[in-house]
């Protein structure tokens, strides 16, 4: 796995899931993978966690607000990749599509904290 990550949470416009996923997989991910510093991508569908109703929990988890996640692996600092990403969006060479609900997008950059640990 690469050193740094972008995590992007998103939703399609209402009723546009199929078109959104087709665009994301066939157009958007390849465009993002063309950005220097982006070395890999993996998309995820929301898998809602069902909490047993008989548990006495101190608080309930709020419902999720996003249905899709993509994790981009980066081989350089997130700021450098973001600068090129935005440059390409403004130039029109990295598209945001017609089915993406831009108002729901959450993009964050992440750098490791400590060493990676694995279960024994």
Descriptions of predicted regions:
Residues 1-120:
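Macromolecular interaction modules
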């Amino acid at each position: 796995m690469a050193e740094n990550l972008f995590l992007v949470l998103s939703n399609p416009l209402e009723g546009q899931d199929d078109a959104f996923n087709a665009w994301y997989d066939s157009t958007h991910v390849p465009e993002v993978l063309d950005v220097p510093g982006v070395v890999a991508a993996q998309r995820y569908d929301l898998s809602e966690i069902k909490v047993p109703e008989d548990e006495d929990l101190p608080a309930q988890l709020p419902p999720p607000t996003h249905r899709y996640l993509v994790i981009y692996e980066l081989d350089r600092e997130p700021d450098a990749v973001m600068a090129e990403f935005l440059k390409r969006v403004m130039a029109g060479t990295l598209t945001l599509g017609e089915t993406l609900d831009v108002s729901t997008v959450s993009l964050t950059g992440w750098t490791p904290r400590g060493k990676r640990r694995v279960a024994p």
